[in-house]
Structure formats: C-alpha cells, structure tokens
C-alpha cells in the first residue's frame, strides 16, 4: 500500500456514496410527489431525513474523537445500506405508509450524520499521509463529489423513468455497501483517536461537546461561515427537495430533464473544483468565495422563475456549476486548518451541523411557498433571498480573515 492509497480509496468510496445519495435525493421527492401529489408532504419527508442528520452530526462529534472517525463511518455506512433498502422493500409489500416512510428516512438521516462527519474528519490525516495540501485534497474531494453527483443525477433520472422511484433506491443501498468495503480496505490504520490528547475517562460526553462549542465560538470566521452557509443550505434544500421537482412536473419537463439538470450542475462544478484543486492555493480566498457564491446562487432561481426556455436554464446552470466548484475547497481548507487535531471530530461535526441546521426547514419552506404563491413566485422569492445572503460577506468584517493564516491554538479546556 502506497502513501496515496488511503486518499484514492477515500475518494473512490466517497464518489460511490455520492452516486447513491444523489439517486435518493431525486427518487425520494419524486416518489412522494407522484404518490401524494403534495408539495407539502414532499417537504415533510425531506425534513424528516435532514433533522436527525443535523442533530446526530452535532452530537456525534465526541464519538468520532473517542472511537475514531473511520470506525464510526464504517458502521454507519453498513447499517445505512439496510435502512435505505427497506423503503422499496416495504413499498413492494404494500407496507410503506406515509408515517412509516417518515420513520425510515429519519433513521437513514440519523446514520448519515455521523457517517458523513467521520469522512470529513479523516481528511487532514489522509492529506498528511499523501503529502498533499488541504486545498488540494479538498479540491479533489469536491471534484469527486460533483462528478459523482452528476453521474448519480443522470442515473436517477433513468432509473426513476424505467423502474420507478422506489426501486431506484436499491442503488443507493448498494452504494453504501460498496463504499463500506472500499473505505475499510484502503484506510486500514488511519482514523484512530488521537492518543494522549482526548481522554474519554477524564471528561464526560457533555463536556466534550462543550469543548467543541467553546472552541468554535472563539473563531469569528468559522461562526460567520456557519451562519451564511446555514441560510444558503436552507434555500438550496428547498430547491432540490421541492422547487426543482415541482418546476419539472408543472412545466412538463419531467423527471428525465430534472435529473439531467442536476447532472449538468454537478458536471460543470467538477471543472471549478479541479481548477481549485490545481491553483486554489494561489487564489485569494475571500474574493473567490464571494464571487463564486454570487454566480452560483440567485441566477439559477431567477431563470427558472421567469419561465425561460430550457436552453437558458441549462446555460445558467453550467455557469453556476463552475462557480460552485470553487466553494468547498476554500471552505474545507479554512475550516480544517483552524481546528486542533484532538478537537477535530467534535468541532468539525458541530461546524457542519450548524451549517445544516436550517435544512430541515428547507423542504417545508419550499412546500409552503409553492402552495401559497405558486412555483414561479416561489422561485423568485428564493432567488432574492439567496442574493441578499451572498452579499453578507461584503458587510461582515470577519469573513476577510479567510485570507489570514490561523494562529496556533491550544485545545479549549472543558467547561462545566
């Protein structure tokens, strides 16, 4: 095994997982929308998955530090395969009522939270072993995420059209199992607790959670990022879970076009992510972050709200995708370089949980906007909200600290 084997294995495992996740992101909303005809119920299902995901991602941070992120990730991926497979299995037996669906997707979300956090927490160690910078590894991870999302979105459109939305979820279940095997084989010996730093016997679980918060709240740039990304994630969740599927259904574009649209977004963002991986270290972080967010956000919503032709929707999506590819490499480097190794699991999990904290409301908000205003006004409102949010870094001074190297920090003592 070479020093780059863990990096390659982690990227492959994550890519496979993202393919399955993208399939479920399209298949589940389409399944609910097709069987119930309700945008509100579609939003509720999205909220039922995201809410426990956020909660368990936040609460699982100390577990990652105590047990090790690799072990947590492997267990969560293995169990997730069977939970996701339960949806089409129960549907085939005629046992998948709406309340049962809510419970199953909630369990899936609860497992995905710490599982995803574990993958992220292994990033700095994998980068160190491979001899790569955080910007480069974050850029490669973003490129894999975007390209896998592109393939998964296209695959989702084909699967839903051919075998149905419920049966398409078997692909997501299989992706968890394959990811489990690849990650387990390629990262042997990595992802263990930091010895001598995190003493599980000396502090309680609650104190370790408090340590994570005590550190995070003293980093103004991380708090600013969390607040902004929480709002943009809220709007994006409304888009992917409700607004885009309803637009595709009401415009007559259909699920195939919806899948292609997501695939184009993912594919074009790969270009941006690869550029960021290659030259990200030389780009000014703050300026790149602001410009990329302005381009990838509001225009997507406005072009759909104006009932533009499909070629215009796809053209804007391509440009937005390229811009979005620059975001995760910047965010990943800024966040990870500021967190001490002994606190990495709990702080990174809490950071991500805050960024995702409003997402459970995204689907519900999207459903309410469509029900109250109609799809075009709902898209326009979402686009304006996105524009206002992406202008925030120009008015909040702490964002400019992105371009500064972090000072050496000592672990924050536990509070009582």
Residue ranges and their predicted role:
Residues 9, 25, 40-41, 71, ...:
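Residue-level recognition of membrane-helix boundary sites in multi-pass small-molecule transporters
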Residues 1-54, 214-265:
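Helix-loop boundary and gating motifs at the non-cytosolic
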Residues 33-43, 86-110, 129-133, 159-170, ...:
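Membrane-interface helix-capping segments at transmembrane helix termini in multi-pass transporters
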């Amino acid at each position: 095994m070479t020093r780059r084997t863990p990096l390659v294995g982690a990227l492959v495992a994550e890519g496979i997982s993202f393919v399955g996740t993208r399939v479920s992101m399209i298949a589940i909303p389409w399944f609910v929308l097709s069987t119930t005809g309700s945008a509100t119920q579609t939003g509720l299902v999205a909220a039922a998955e995201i809410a426990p995901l956020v909660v368990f991602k936040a609460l699982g941070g100390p577990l990652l530090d105590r047990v090790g992120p690799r072990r947590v990730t492997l267990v969560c991926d293995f169990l997730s395969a069977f939970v996701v497979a339960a949806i089409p299995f129960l549907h085939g037996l005629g046992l998948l009522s709406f309340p049962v669906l809510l419970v199953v997707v909630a369990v899936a979300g609860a497992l995905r939270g710490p599982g995803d956090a574990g993958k992220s927490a292994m990033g700095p160690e994998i980068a160190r072993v491979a001899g790569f910078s955080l910007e480069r590894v974050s850029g490669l991870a973003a490129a894999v995420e975007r390209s896998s999302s592109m393939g998964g979105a296209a695959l989702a459109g084909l699967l839903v059209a051919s075998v149905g939305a419920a049966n398409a979820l078997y692909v997501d279940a299989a992706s968890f199992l394959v990811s489990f095997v690849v990650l387990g084989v390629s990262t042997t010996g990595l992802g263990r607790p930091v010895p001598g730093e995190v003493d599980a016997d000396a502090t309680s679980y609650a104190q370790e959670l408090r340590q994570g918060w005590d550190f995070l709240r003293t980093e103004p740039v991380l708090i600013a990022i969390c607040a902004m990304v929480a709002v943009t994630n809220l709007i994006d969740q409304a888009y992917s879970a409700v607004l885009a599927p309803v637009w595709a259904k009401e415009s007559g574009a259909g699920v195939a076009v919806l899948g292609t649209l997501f695939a184009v977004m993912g594919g074009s963002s790969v270009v941006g992510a690869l550029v960021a991986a290659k030259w990200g270290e030389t780009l000014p972080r703050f300026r790149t972050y602001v410009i990329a967010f302005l381009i990838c956000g509001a225009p997507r919503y406005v072009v759909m709200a104006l009932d533009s032709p499909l070629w215009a929707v796809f053209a804007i999506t391509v440009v937005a995708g390229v811009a979005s590819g620059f975001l995760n490499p910047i965010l990943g480097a800024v966040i990870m370089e500021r967190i001490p190794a002994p606190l990495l699991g709990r702080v990174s999990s809490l950071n991500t949980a805050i960024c995702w904290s409003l997402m459970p409301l995204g689907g519900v908000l999207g459903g309410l906007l469509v029900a109250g205003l109609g799809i075009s006004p709902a898209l326009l409102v979402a686009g304006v909200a996105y524009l206002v949010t992406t202008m925030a870094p120009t008015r909040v001074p702490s964002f400019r600290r992105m371009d500064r190297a972090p000072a050496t920090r000592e672990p924050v003592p536990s509070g009582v």
